[in-house]
Amino acid sequence: MVVDRTGQAEAFDAIGKRYDEAFPHKEGQIAAVQRLLAELPAQARVLDVGCGTGLPTCGQLADAGHRVTGVDLSAGMLELARTHVPGAEFLHRDLASLRVEGPGGLGRFDGVTCFFTLLMLPREEIPHALRLLRSLLVPGGHLALSMVEADLDDAGIPFLGHTLRVSGYLREELRRVVSEAGFEITGEDDYAYAPASTDAPPEYQLFLNCRRD
């Protein structure tokens, strides 16, 4: 079953630039991209899935000389991203619609980033989403992803004046799900994170760097 996430997109449209204000410290995300950059060839094609405002990831990748495509379901976030990172390409797409070939096909990428995007899916959809991301990578390509560590499945949480439905895994379960989707985990990090806004709960963030096997 594919869940309609229109309401999630509308929430992020309304949140807009307040997202970066509420989450100003993104050391874990920046470090995961640094690990990815060490594995990429020059002028690599890199896809940022759930790119949000384009910061910091699309900017970090573009500044390193790579060809960056960002996709997001929120038109409002994409408008900000185009301003923040004018050298990247931004597309209004749902993760589930991404494909290599055919109408709207994106081709394959040397690297994919997917930070806190999978947590917006019910658990039953996450393994399929990971396999889809794998299909978008060249053989031996690299994925950097993050999730919030939590034993949740499509649970409603308050977030910057809105209610979002989110899922999460405990660490060992996340490793298992990622490995079963066809990835070798090559790096891992975690951060305890307290948002600047009191309208977003504290969280424990997990970052994985992976290679398509």
Question: Which ranges hold each PLM region?
Answer:
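Acceptor-substrate binding/catalytic loop of class I
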Residues: I157-E173
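Core SAM-dependent methyltransferase catalytic element
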Residues: A194-D213
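Conserved beta-strand signature within the Rossmann-like core of class I S-adenosyl-L-methionine
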Residues: G140-M147
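Conserved S-adenosyl-L-methionine
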Residues: E184-A194
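Class I SAM-dependent methyltransferase SAM/SAH-binding core
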Residues: L47, T53-L98
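A short glycine-rich, Lys/Arg-flanked "PGG" loop and its adjoining helix->strand segment in the class I
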Residues: P127-P139
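A conserved beta-strand element that flanks and buttresses the S-adenosyl-L-methionine
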Residues: T113-C114
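Conserved class I S-adenosyl-L-methionine
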Residues: M1-A42, D151
